[in-house]
Amino acid sequence: MNLMAQFTYDLNPVDFIIADAVGEPGKRTFYLQARAGKQSVSLVLEKQEVNNLAASVLQLLAELEEKYEDLPPIAHAKKVVYPEQPVEPSFRIGQLLIGYDEDTDRIWLIAKALMVNEEGSVIDPDDERVPSARIVTTRQQMYTMSEHALEVVSRGRPICPLCGRAIDRLGHFCPRTDGQAVPIIL
């Protein structure tokens, strides 16, 4: 089976992977970027998707440590990885799958683009026209990516303790106060 025919981008194994953001808080664009040799890919995600990916990876790593006690430990020292600039998105992620290959001790991600047809309906991610990427990493690379991703997500605007919405620099009118409170301004 020709895997390159299955994936628009097939990065196996990657030299680096990072989840990061560009722009000012409140207007940031979040992305997942990976490189293998001369091939690189930058994939756009939402902030919450980056957070969910990082949390899922850390949960998977914990489960793997429990299940496979003989796996080499992950170093918890932070390795600095910098994204390639400029960030040129290949596509916006519509579907993201994560898995583990115990034979190679590698974690893989399969990302499929979010595409819509002329009528505005979402195209099935399994449609052969939908761009996709396979990213194969070490457990260490995914740990480092996840720790950095959580740090990047936390750099955003503070969250209102009452309604859970982001507080803008210009102020925040919380719907939970029903207009009866002074706006929160940072």
Regions found by a protein language model. Give the residues of each.
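Positively charged, low-complexity terminal tracts
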Residues: 1-186
